[in-house]
């Protein structure tokens, strides 16, 4: 067992085996629970990244004004913009790092699921973890998690498109966010359905978190507006 398998694969095998036991061997529900747990773990980072995105969206008029005023001096313009970011405690790289981090997780899980599907898990299991007698690879009675699923690919692309439009991302970020699910849609035949199911669960929790952030932001704006009026 190499270092990658020891640090990434073995914990995933054991955690998924534990979740599969809780779901009576249903791998589909175990994967959805795994997606929810991972999403909750990275929630603080996501919240910070989205907070920076909202601040940057509000600062766009000032940024455009600086760019217009100093269009002949791009270096100075960038310095002024970075000064604003520093004053507002904004890290413009947070959202990019978060996207790449999500992709790194997805790629790791892609490799993991490709190996785990249909293979023997016992060599990777800790002594205190028991695998269910039978793993059910049929989700909702008709989706074979071992094979590609056009239905799940369409659901994934649709959910991610919706998420992209409700997030306060810049144009470049939106292209990255919108492009990834459609890559899955176009190349879904290369992905076992279990991977797409994970991404569907991950995105559903993401949408819920985005709703919570939007609601909190609206309440803050209303409070500020009321104080200003008074």
Give residue spans per PLM region.
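Helix-loop-helix
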Residues: 1-230
């Amino acid at each position: 067992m190499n270092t990658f398998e020891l640090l990434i694969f073995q914990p995933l095998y054991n955690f998924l085996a534990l979740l599969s036991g809780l779901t009576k061997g249903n791998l589909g529900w175990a994967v959805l629970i795994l997606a929810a747990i991972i999403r909750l773990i990275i929630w603080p980072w996501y919240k910070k990244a989205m907070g920076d995105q909202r601040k940057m969206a509000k600062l766009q008029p000032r940024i455009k004004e600086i760019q217009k005023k100093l269009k002949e001096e791009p270096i100075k313009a960038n310095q002024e913009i970075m000064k604003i970011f520093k004053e507002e405690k904004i890290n413009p790289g947070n959202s990019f790092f978060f996207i790449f981090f999500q992709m790194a997780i997805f790629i790791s899980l892609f490799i993991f699921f490709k190996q785990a599907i249909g293979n023997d898990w016992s060599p990777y299991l800790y002594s205190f973890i028991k695998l269910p007698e039978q793993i059910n690879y049929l989700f909702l009675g008709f989706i074979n998690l071992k094979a590609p699923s056009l239905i799940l690919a369409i659901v994934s692309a649709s959910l991610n498109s919706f998420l992209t439009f409700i997030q306060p991302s810049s144009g470049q970020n939106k292209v990255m966010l919108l492009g990834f699910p459609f890559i899955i849609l176009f190349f879904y035949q290369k992905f076992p359905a279990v991977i797409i199911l994970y991404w569907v669960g991950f995105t559903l929790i993401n949408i819920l978190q985005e709703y919570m952030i939007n609601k909190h932001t609206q309440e803050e704006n209303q409070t500020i507006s009321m104080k200003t009026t008074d």
